Structures are given as structure tokens and as C-alpha cells.
Design a protein with these regions (language model features):
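Cytosolic nucleotide-utilizing catalytic cores of signal-transduction proteins
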Residues: 2-186
Length: 186
């Protein structure tokens, strides 16, 4: 870091941009054009679908500010290259040695978001909540829990009206009041 003349203890955010569907090699160039300061911001090609952006930020940068940066990257790639992306944001690292952890967190954010929040294209590691905890559980423990909660043939024992109500509940994004309006329940 000393030989390259950049600060080791500056706050930085890691954004992992994953291209969904088709990938474009020009993604790195487009992102590098968005962050031209090569001494503070770094754009790294990880593999054919992933690009990491390490952005130096100020001390007062909020999670909302990070989401705005991610949104601008998403919009630029969508408009210029017609690429659909999912962006994971790691926690802010205050030192160079913490960047690897932040990168892993950005990866985890994408993986957890793929399972628990498929609608979002920008996922912040700090906002994963209980999904992060569940994601880290061993598969066998999840299978045991599911087999205890959902007994064999339990869905078969439900009548048609109950199944209809459950389907409406999911169609209305788990919104009880909207479901009751649709079912005329008062």
C-alpha cells in the first residue's frame, strides 16, 4: 500500500456486482468510468459474471448513500449495456485488511437475497436480518425442523377453502388486510 501510495486506513465499501443472464466484458470499463479516481476507488473483475467495486467513502456515509451508489451502478449498466444485475453491499471496512471480510459479506448478501428476497436487486449485508441467521444453519438442522413442523401429508388434511385462503394470502404478499378485502372477510 505504501509503494502504491494509497491510504490503508480509509473507510471503504465493497460492492459485488453480479451480472444475471448474459455477461458483458465491457462491465468493468463502464464501472471504471463511473469511478475514475484510481487512487481511491478500485474496479476488479472477479470472474466472467462478477465485478467488485471498492469505493472509498467519507465517515458520514449512510447505508442509504451506499444504496444510492449501488442503484446508480445498476441503472448505468442497465442503460448502457442492457445488463440485469444483482448487487451485494458488504459492511464498511475502516482498514485495508478488513476488505476481504466485506467482500465475503457482499457475496453472502447476494446468496441470502437470492433465497429470502428475490424481488430486490440491491442487498445490503447489514439489512439481511433473520435471513442471514437461517442461511447459516446446517441443512440437516433445517430438514429436521421442517419435518417436525410440517408432518407428513399435513397439506392433504386441509380443506379446499383453507387452501384457497392460504393461496390468496401468498398472492397478496402476506398482507392480512389485503387478503381479507379480497376474500370479503370482516
Amino acid at each position: 500500500a505504501k509503494e502504491l501510495h494509497f491510504a490503508t486506513d480509509a473507510p471503504r465499501a465493497v460492492f459485488l456486482i453480479r451480472q444475471v443472464g448474459h455477461s458483458d466484458v465491457a462491465t468493468v470499463d463502464v464501472l471504471a468510468g463511473m469511478f475514475p479516481d484510481k487512487m481511491q476507488d478500485f474496479v476488479l473483475s472477479i470472474n466472467e459474471s462478477d465485478v467488485a467495486v471498492i469505493k472509498q467513502i467519507t465517515g458520514g456515509t449512510t447505508p442509504e448513500d451506499l444504496e444510492k451508489i449501488a442503484k446508480s451502478m445498476e441503472d448505468t449498466l442497465k442503460n448502457e449495456l442492457r445488463i440485469k444485475t444483482v448487487i451485494g453491499i458488504g459492511t464498511v471496512s475502516d482498514h485495508l485488511r478488513e476488505l476481504a471480510d466485506s467482500y465475503k459479506e457482499a457475496q453472502t448478501a447476494i446468496d441470502v437475497g437470492k433465497v429470502f428476497d428475490t424481488e430486490k436487486s440491491i442487498i445490503d449485508y447489514e439489512n439481511l436480518g433473520i435471513g442471514r441467521l437461517i442461511y447459516q444453519l446446517p441443512t440437516t438442522l433445517c430438514e429436521i425442523f421442517l419435518s417436525e413442523v410440517f408432518k407428513k401429508n399435513s397439506i392433504d388434511s386441509l380443506d379446499q377453502e383453507t387452501l384457497f385462503t392460504i393461496n390468496k394470502f401468498f398472492e397478496n404478499n402476506l398482507n392480512v388486510s389485503e387478503t381479507s378485502r379480497k376474500l370479503f372477510v370482516h
